[in-house]
């Protein structure tokens, strides 16, 4: 009998899939649940076993997710249209583990629960095909044409326990929590407050916090002088910044498949870390570096969001980002209050910024040199403007009234 490995979340879709695959495709079903900061892992594992999955794998990947995926995104200020890529970053890691576990048990098929309207189907399937072209991907949600009410009825008929009180579709990992659902689709209404779980709404956030974040080579390594693993540092900041109302993102998103989607993200740690990292970059990179890096950051976000983590171009992008971040080290002091972040200090040994050079009372910068610079700098504009007689005549012939 053929085997299929299901990326299992414990929700309605993937729970129904276990029975559906067994019943309609006559396959043995194994499940893989990746721990990247999810909750209720024990309950998910028990549920998979109860539904007849065998074997059932739960893989703790929080540290790997932080160090191999989030770290690269931090260096690239990873943001797609203002969204810190939390879900998008996790999908290629899940695809990698799915391929490895499927190969380990001799499964010919990998199954995921993404719909035909979203981005995740692209992210999973492009990565799986790149990693193992012989692996086949099954997507029952696209094939069985069941609406939610049909899935609920199927679950009841087959003795599958499901929670029916969930208003939203939620995906979470340590880098962020994403929420979508019918109550968010009417953009004529405000976002219901029951959406928020990680972040206290700014208008209700009374907690104020000040802290120092130290970066080493572009990666945060310390909070207030205490060294921390990246995953632990992120979890700590999620709680602290969230209590100050930091990290709410009400987002209208352009999906890969061409649809627009209204989603809400809660990304406290990602918001704080990216803000501090950008500020540190502004103190260290010169203008040419900053301009090129800004374009590279956008390319990184576009490729990650679009499911192209395993495209060879990412090797070049990540290598460039690592080079730009080589000297991004220092300490940033941030105050967080009512959803707003304030930079209250910066320290480091690689800063190009110098108060002595910019100070108006300083003699360190010879202002007399500016005249020659302006003459040379403006040559192209002056000559190209004056080669057009019509433009010169229009300016010279215009009158000014006093």
UniProtKB/Swiss-Prot annotation:
Pathway: Amino-acid biosynthesis; L-arginine biosynthesis; L-arginine from L-ornithine and carbamoyl phosphate: step 2/3. Its EC number is 6.3.4.5. PROSITE patterns: ARGININOSUCCIN_SYN_1, ARGININOSUCCIN_SYN_2. L-aspartate binds at residues 115, 119-120. Coiled coil: none annotated. GO terms for biological process: argininosuccinate metabolic process; L-arginine biosynthetic process; urea cycle. L-citrulline binds at residues 83, 119, 123, 169, 178, 253, 265. The keyword Amino-acid biosynthesis applies. One of its GO terms (cellular component) is cytoplasm. Homotetramer. This is Argininosuccinate synthase. The gene is argG.
């Amino acid at each position: 009998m053929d085997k299929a490995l299901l990326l299992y979340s414990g929700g309605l879709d993937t729970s129904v899939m276990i029975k559906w695959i067994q019943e309609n495709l006559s396959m043995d079903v194994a499940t893989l649940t990746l721990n990247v900061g999810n909750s209720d892992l024990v309950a998910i594992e028990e549920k998979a076993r109860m539904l007849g999955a065998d074997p059932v794998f739960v893989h703790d990947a929080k540290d790997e997710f932080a160090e191999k995926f989030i770290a690269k995104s931090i260096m690239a200020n990873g943001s797609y249209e203002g969204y810190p890529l939390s879900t998008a970053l996790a999908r290629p890691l899940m695809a990698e583990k799915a391929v490895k576990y499927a190969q380990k048990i001799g499964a010919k098929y990998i199954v995921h629960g993404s719909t035909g309207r979203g981005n995740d189907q692209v992210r999973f399937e492009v990565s799986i095909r790149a990693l193992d072209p012989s692996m086949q991907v099954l997507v029952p949600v696209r094939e069985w044409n069941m609406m939610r009410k049909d899935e609920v009825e199927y679950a009841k008929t087959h003795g599958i326990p499901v929670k029916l009180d969930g208003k939203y579709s939620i995906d979470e990992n340590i880098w962020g929590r994403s929420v979508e659902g019918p109550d968010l689709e009417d953009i004529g209404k405000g976002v219901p407050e029951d959406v928020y779980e990680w972040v206290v709404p700014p208008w209700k956030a009374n907690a104020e916090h000040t802290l120092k974040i130290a970066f080493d080579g572009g990666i945060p390594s310390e909070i207030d002088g205490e060294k921390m693993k990246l995953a632990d540092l992120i979890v700590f900041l999620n709680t602290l910044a969230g209590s100050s109302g930091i990290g709410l993102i009400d987002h209208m998103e352009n999906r890969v498949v061409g649809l627009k989607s209204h989603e809400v993200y809660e990304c406290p740690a990602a918001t704080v870390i990216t803000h501090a990292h950008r500020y540190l970059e502004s103190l260290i990179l010169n203008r040419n570096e900053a301009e090129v890096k800004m374009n590279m950051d956008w390319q990184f976000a576009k490729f990650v969001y679009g499911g192209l983590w395993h495209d060879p171009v990412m090797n070049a992008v990540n290598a460039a980002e690592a080079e730009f971040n080589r000297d991004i080290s220092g300490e940033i002091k941030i105050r967080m209050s009512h959803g707003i972040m304030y930079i209250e200090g910066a320290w480091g040994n690689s800063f190009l910024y110098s108060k002595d050079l910019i100070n108006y009372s300083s003699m360190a910068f010879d202002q007399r040199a500016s005249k020659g610079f302006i003459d040379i700098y403006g040559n192209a504009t002056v000559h190209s403007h004056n080669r057009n007689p019509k433009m010169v005549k229009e300016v010279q012939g215009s009158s000014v009234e006093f």
